[in-house]
Curated annotation (Swiss-Prot):
Pfam family, one: PhnI
Origin organism lineage: Bacteria, Pseudomonadati, Pseudomonadota, Alphaproteobacteria, Hyphomicrobiales
GO molecular function: alpha-D-ribose 1-methylphosphonate 5-triphosphate synthase activity
UniProt entry tagged with the keyword S-adenosyl-L-methionine: no
Name of the protein in its database record: Alpha-D-ribose 1-methylphosphonate 5-triphosphate synthase subunit PhnI
Keyword tags: Plasmid, Transferase
Gene: phnI
Amino acid sequence: MYVAVKGGEAAIANAHRLLADRRRGDRALPAITIDQVVEQLGLAVDRVMAEASLYDRALAALAVRQARGDMIEAIFILRAYRTTLPRFGYCEPVDTAKMKVERRVSATYKDLPGGQLLGPTFDYTHRLLDPSLIGEEPVDEPVLKEPGEHVMRVSDILDGEGLIEGDGKMPEGHVAGDLTREPMEFPMARDLRLQALARGDEGFLLALAYSTQRGYGRTHPFVGEVRIGEVEVELELPELGFAVSLGVIRVTECQMVNQFKGSSRQPPQFTRGYGLVFGQSERKAMSMSLVDRALRTDEFDEDIVAPAQDQEFVISHADNVQATGFVEHLKLPHYVDFQAELDLVRRMRREHDAAQAGGKDGMKEAAE
């Protein structure tokens, strides 16, 4: 039983003023602009866009600033805004093979068509604090080169030998589900699972992915490929009879390659885990691909022996906005509930004390 209690209007207004004051900080310092957040805190912006399921860098930056850097609060704000937007259709599946690649690495082949493109990455930094960032020291311009040969997919190389499962195909006339408009039902189709994972909490997915590497799941993965870059978004217009471009978005894609010994329905081969997220977030994409493969137990006749393989456990707990709402609702008044519990504990304590006293008297009489 929950009891709604309206706080004092003046107290709430003062709390909002105090929040705005803390958000602004020292008035002697210039306020952070939205452009600064977009350009200099880009990975935070990318995470908010990904987990709010709304690709808009300026709005995500505004949410980050409004939330004082609290990522989950920013995601909540942007997701709430998303519900106010009109929906006018579904785009065509993005073709990541045509991606304008900025970063592409593979752990399976050293030399492959298109080469290894390191791009902007922390992988080779020393993780030491850099005092030069405190000031306004100039930053060297990057060295840019013309693109070379076509950046071929690693999965296409393996597919040429027939050693990896093919790209998943939906039945004729299949309409993709929409997790934001339909209640969750289990077992859940893979397209809906991927939607849930794409907007799931990065930390939760990272922990689950890590668990699969520590023995809680049957995966032996290799990073077939991680690629980051821009892809074109197209929408088919019935009145024209063909798709038109709406623009480009930046995404991170990961294809995880896993060994599979075969089953009664499938031959020995490599299987895939897939991850695709807005912006640059390869940790999230890699975690998503590991969890995606772990959840495909029914396709490969595998037993569910670990949390990462349990659809209901994973999907029901991946959403950080939902999780935050349930955990933080405990701050709301539960006065009636607590009074009932308090009365119950007091009564049980009286009964316990009476039983203890009766037991002592009985022992005393027996001794006499």
